[in-house]
Each structure stands twice: as C-alpha cells, then as structure tokens.
Amino acid sequence: VQISFDRDYIFCGEEANLVETIVNNKYLPLPVLEVGFDMSRWVVFQDEENSTVSDMTYRRDVFTASVRQRITRTLPVRGKKRGYYRIASTTVTSYDFLMTEKQVAHFPQETEFYVLPAHISASHIRIPYSKIMGLLVSRRRVYDDPFEFAGIRDYRRSDPMKYINWKASARGGTLLVNQHDSTLSQKVTVLLDCTGIGSAVTDALNETAISIAAELAERMLADGISVSAISNGIDTVDGKMLSTGELTGRNTALYLRRQLARLECRNDLTPMPQLLRTLHDGAHGSDLYVLISKEQKLPVLPDLEALTEGSDAIWILPEDRNMPERYKLTETSKSVEIVRWEV
C-alpha cells in the first residue's frame, strides 16, 4: 500500500490529488481490504464520504483486490491552510472469505506535502515593493563607490561635474559620465513576526504577513537582490526559529516558500522587540531591513530604529480594517517608513 500526492506542493487554496495504490501480489484474492490513514484536517477531501474530521482527518477506504491486481484510486484534495503535512503510516485490514477472521497490518509511509503561503496579487504587492526598490536605488545613489567603475552613460543635469568623463565626451561630441557601483550590497533582510494564534483576526493577520514575506522575497530574488529571512516563528520540523541566511537567485524562492510553509505561529514566541535587540549585535549596516509585523501594542519602533542605526527601513503593518482608530499605532519615525496593509 502506498499513499502519495501527484504534486510536491500547492499554494494555499489550490487543489491536488492524493493517490492510493494497492498491489496484491498473491495468488489469492482479497474480498474486503480496508485502508485507513490520518492526516491534517487542513488538507480537505472533496469527497468526504469515507472521512471523519475532528482534530485530524481520518480516512477509511474499502477495496476488493483480485489475484495479482494493482489498484489506483485518485482522491482530489484542497489545501485549506498553509502548512507542512505528513502521512506517517497506513493501517490495512483484510478478512477471509467467510468474514470470520480479521488480519491487521501497518505500512510505514513517507508522504510529505507542502501547502505554500497564498499568492498575493500584483496590484496589492506593488506599493510596498516599489517602496523597497526606491530605497535601494536611493541608497546606491548616496553611496556610489568611485573605485568601482560600471560603465558610461549620457550626462543628466543632476549628475555631479566630477563624474564627467572628459575624454569620452570629447570623442563622442556630447557629455558622458562615469557610472559607479555602490559600496552597499543589494541585500534585504526580511523580519517576520508570527506571534499570536487562536482568534480569526490574529490568524488572518499572521497568514497575510507570511504571504507578504514570500511574495516580496520572490520578486526581489528574481530582480537579483539577495534576501535573508528571520522570524520568531518556529519551524515545525527542527523546532528552531527561522533564519535562512543569505539567499540569491530566483531558484531559491521555492526553498524560502517551503520554509515559510513550515512556520508555526504561537502565543509563546519571542516578542519582536526582544528579537530586534538580539539581532542588533550581528546587524549589517549595509542591509535594508523590512519588518512585517502586526504588533501595535509593544514598542517595536525604537528597537527597529536601533537595529538599523538610523538608516532607512520599512515596516509593513498588517492590521484589521475594523480596528478602532484609538488602538492603532500613532508613532512615526524619520528613518522607518510604515506601510499599512488592511486585512
């Protein structure tokens, strides 16, 4: 007996197929064969006739296997919630022809399935992404390295006179300027807050924050920007807080999405202000920090400013659109731009 999925992963809300494969290699038929397994209730069967749902989904399917027969049954499922899901074993029950004797066997399975964070539409992600790119471009302009030559282009009125290449201008008959690479690396560190669980509003805000992190990171990696992701959320596989290290190239986007799929939001996580203070000693001044956090009660802003040491940063703030104004964050910062995201 083998249980598998026809895809390794789907995005939240998408569909896949769970495939049950039964092989009877014996020279005797099996008139009744019951195959049972359990998995997370957040992977939903379209046909719930043979399923019992409580804290888990318990599935029981009945087969009749002829002599040396292979049976394949496909069951459509939908990923209802982001997560990393496993099926560890199946229980197989068979009976004799008279239905008087029962045999039970257990088959280990190594079935893994990822439901990745939900996609966010381009129209919604465009504003925060353009703000990130704008900060990266402005930082490059401020910190051009005169020793890192990157080519020649036409003169613009905003260019300093010291950048004019007089020899090239004389040959071309028009003013040309030298281009320089930046002393700052094009690197963004995404700080993701996963604190809280239990209420529909809290869960929705956390899931939105995780989806924003995934979407922004994928776009930045595709544009050649290095990305690191750090979160107080706990990896359900190794039990540690997420810290990806530096990722480069569009091919690492799927790896990051898988890591985010495994994040567990809890009430007992390290508070974001404390995590920011912990990160301060190892901070890289050249990185652009992007905080994604719904936190509006604890004093996050001073610790974020201390982490960036006065450099520009962005705080994407998912918030409940029904939240009363008196509970909303009113603090402002010269160096941290707060981008509100209604959910």
Label for each model-derived stretch:
Residues V1-G239:
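An amphipathic, basic-hydrophobic helix/alpha-beta surface used to engage anionic
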